[in-house]
Amino acid sequence: MTVSGRSSWQNGKTTNAMRAGKLATERDLESANYGSRSVEKLRHERAVGNLNKGRFLGMNKWSDEQLKHSMARYEDLAATRHNLFAVIMPSGCGKTSLARTYGMVDVDELVSRAEHDQYVEMRNEIVCGRGDWHDHNTLWFARLNQTLALLDYSVPVVIFVHTEETALEIGARPVACLTLETTAHEMNISGRGPKFREFSRESLRSCKPSNRVPNQYRFKSNKELEAFFLEVMNVSGLPVGAPFKYSTSIWNSSYSRDVPGWILRGERAGTQQVSINELRLLFEQGKIPKECVDYYVRASYVPTQFDFGVTMFEWSQALGQLPGCYNSRRDFDTLTDLMGVFPPHSPKEVTRSNVTLRTLCHTFDILSMPDAKEIASYHVGEGHTLVTNLLANWKGITQFTTVSHLVFPWFKVCERDWSDKMKTLHSLVRCSKFFMNTRITEKDRQALMYMDLLVGRGEYTVDEMAEVELRTDDTYNTKHLSYDPNRQVFTNQQYKKDFITSVEEAYVRLKIEPKPVNVDGFIDFYHRRASWLTKGGLVYNKLPPEMKKFGGQVFDAIYNTCREIQGRHNKKSLFEVYELAEVLQGANENNFNLTKTQIKYEVGKKDRTLLPGTLVHFVVFTYVLYLAEKQGQIGSVRLNTDSEVDIRYFDKKMCTGVFHVLYDWADFNEQHSAWEMGVVVDYLKHLIVAPRDYAVFVEAIVAGMYNMGLHDRDGNVHKIWRGLYSGWRGTTWINTVLNFCYVHIALQNVERLFGVRVVLYVDHGGDDIDLGLSEPAVMPWFLEVMDAMLFKANKWKQMFGTRSEFFRNTICDGRVYASPTRALASFVAGDWEGAGRATVKERVVSLLDQIAKLRRRGCSEELCQGLTIATISHWCRIKDGEDWLSLPAEIIHGHPDDGGLGVPDRDNNFWRLEEKVPEINEEWYKVVVPDYKASRDYVNVLARDVEKFSLVIEEREKLARKLSEDSYDIEKSVDHERWKHLLNFRTRVIAKELAVEPMEDSVVFEGFLEYEVEEGTEKKFDLASRYQEFVSYLSLNGRAITKEELLDLMSDGEVCLEAIEFQGDIYYARLVPEFIAYRATMFCKEAINKGVCDAISAQLFFRTICWMSASVFEHAI
């Protein structure tokens, strides 16, 4: 082994003193005049012709002027990159391998693959005499510095480069130049193509750094080179994993002296003997550096664990993709029509968006702010929603993070590449509590996730054949495997046995405690269709066009006018007009389970496809699930269980000592075989106490699993072999039950293979899993088993650690968090599906709920307050003739008790009005709908149900007509007609009251903290409130019945009317997550019902609980 060709080590051996004398010292690294000494050396070597012997990356082309420029660049950059250190290694010497292993930066990864290939081609052209090194270097170094400007240098960063000149140009201080002898080098490059081999050889020949570069050694093997590299890291005081892997001669100051030797030596890496959790604890105690934990995590089966594993290698690789995606900065006139400067891609970007650039300019004068103007200038000509989102996100969220200076350049990425690049960065942020080298809070982590969604919603052409290919197979059977303990191998036969057992386990409560359902058969169920049909789209159907439309009238009794209303049927209104036989004409076994592709209007423009089932399939599946969903909980999943806002789902995850496996499936829907889906549904007919015809409908659904097809836009039908449709009535049921079965079998296999049972709880629903374990060592075993069972997952998306994440809610350090960026992206884009049918009050409530969510999650108060005023003003407009007129401010900000909408003004005040807003009497309007068949049948069924309590429904036809009005999509039209009468309302504001003010009472709050919801409490209140919505149509013994009398009848006198009518103060409820507001409501209802307080006192209790919960718990969800 030679030392840069200048001297040799005797027999390849040296003393520690000799080695230390040749290694970089901290004093060398901190020497401020390294650059000036280096430039003189380079000038001298050029003068004697040393540089003229090589032709690699243009070293023989440097002039004195270029050298001066290079050193000037170094001195400028070294000041800001004082923690950037370079290891010089020619191509083919293993720099990428070392960078990946030890989590460092590889110069070749600082550009995208396409850019890298372009630079390689340029070099090949120059070597062949067709090109200029000066042009190449100017572009190359400038491009490297673009990426390096994005990195975090708060702690030392090591970069592997080809040459000393590269180090100078990027402001890095060389600590070593490590090369291989020819034989070892040739072995390394033997697998490369001819051009790359020649490039690597030229790189090695031309690597002749100045004498100022310390530690210039040539090695016989990769192992020797790696050993010396670690010694360089040790003597330089740079943190690195496995510092004593080859030698213990030089201590690394990043480690405590009492760290176990096996950790220092990097032993057991990749084995089950290593506890990543123990390494994490050592890091938290300050005994080992992050690089040590990263080293072991990266060697394990799971690339990220306990927030470790994401290194500067991944960060630099991801950030290296950004500069090539930057737009050029373009100036624009801020006073012109911004819709022209930033054009919307779709009319819905204008008609459905809650926020536009005009909103931001009018409310905040946002483009007068230099940072916002700069961001916008990089996106001239790009989508309106994207630019709106970027400005709102930066000013309301991102600029307040501790790493905002590092994130700001991201906002230059063009719209075309925004989503893809931000998804990659989202994964790095999600899997770590470090933003590169900076440890960030959970609040900041949440703010920096989901930035890919800022691109908004969009319309696109579905790739139908891609959906077919995802679901193409050669069998209906499952190909999943399970471990056979007898044969000691994973087999499909064992999996099928285990799957049947897991389904039985999932449905065990249905077998042990079956619950009868008040349905006599399908006909009885059909007569109740007004209660189970939804107002969703008609999905896939064979209806003629004329059957999909309806017409109605609205009579205005005040102005004596009649307005014709035309609309398209939804599922509910269709069955008001047509009977089942008419709707299902032409349905048969061949088209029973077909689908067509539809757009999913998701934020982030994910271009995912909605696959709805047929209308007849919907009806059949609804009957099957109508009975199943009234049974007990399914396994440990969130089916037939407590409300999603039950605090127990969150409370049990706030304790310490639990380790979480957050498994992320890849294309979960497509992994299910027809056999697995069929078994999940088929078992229902054996377990549910059901009418005789129930089994026929179950079997129809099961048979349909084996006869699926996709009807494309050209009229062709393509065979579907596997996977469920995302728009089935039973999609959630099948996904969730299969989630349970898959995990149940996997845990069984873990026990068979490793002999451990450490599961504390399993929480899963849909395709989400949160597996709570008592022993962290089992976590990677679970992933290994899932892989062995042939389930598909993205390893980089798996989260193993102490943090819980479920349904995009994160529980960490006793608090619940969710991403403000995700909520903002959805809010700005608006609802592209259902918002068009919302009434004014519904829209106002929805907007206030969404803005409250933004506020809780950490959006700035200024942004939230401004968006409240702007969006409410926008949507509280009524069309009168050709004009859109705003509702009077008195109505918008008027106190609800005075008939106002109750929107707090800029000062968070309600307005008390001298004259109340006139109540819009429903008798002013009469809506004539085409028919009300479903509602009429439902009223007849209700009549039979209430007869059990000696109650009679009076005026059945009137009630049926009234119920049917809700089936048609006419609310908005009727609502606007009503509000038009109030456009000219004016009155004097006599006082203003704070919507929310501090409320504190430690006694009440302590009582709330000790409160436990008794089993059956919610059910008790639900049963007591039965039929209250029909009370005005009910009679008992020939006379009208009161609310109190009906309540006594339904609850046997156990519940009082004040308790079931108590709702809490919505303005205080918005201060806290739903699970706290729900619990506070139940607490107050119980207090009223038990006579502890009246409704007025309960309202004070509720406000106090919400106010104190917000300040004490600080949940950000």
UniProtKB/Swiss-Prot annotation:
Reaction it catalyzes: RNA(n) + a ribonucleoside 5'-triphosphate = RNA(n+1) + diphosphate
InterPro entries: DNA/RNA_pol_sf, RNA-dir_pol_luteovirus
GO biological process, one term: DNA-templated transcription
Superkingdom in the source lineage: Viruses
Molecular functions (GO terms): hydrolase activity; nucleotide binding; RNA binding; RNA-directed RNA polymerase activity
Biased composition (Polar residues): 1-17
Nucleotidyltransferase in keyword set: yes
Purpose of the protein: RNA-dependent RNA polymerase which replicates the viral genome.
Name this polypeptide is given: RNA-directed RNA polymerase
